Amino acid sequence: MLALTSIVSLIYAEDDGLAFLTSALIAFAVGGALHTAGSKKEGKRMTRADSFLIVALTWVLFSAIGMMPFILHLRMSPADAFFEAMSGFTTTGATIIADVDGLTYGLRFWRSMMHWIGGLGIIVFSVALIPVYEMKNSNVY
């Protein structure tokens, strides 16, 4: 998604494309390292607690990677950039950016993608919980 956002920046001839490409390379490196470290071991089964831990850590990891363009291009502090990314991936909609309309098209696209991915993640997480806890649909909403 970060690489796709750099294409948006390229189309609009904006100067934030390098921030997205750098972030994409960092994400690729982290993903490769986690894939190598988490290769399936024989005889190991994932427990319910492991599943919840993975979901929670994934949200934190997505936010840590998602904050990179804000740090690299807008020179935001890490705390502000993490807040902005976590807000997007949890779909809370809160922002600390005073002029969202003044952002580049690439950053606006990235913010939109974070909210979309976050919304999709919450739906998938909810659907995954229903069978585990044998909930009825009326108990979810």
Predicted features and spans:
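Membrane-proximal intracellular helices of multi-pass ion channels
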Residues: 1-141
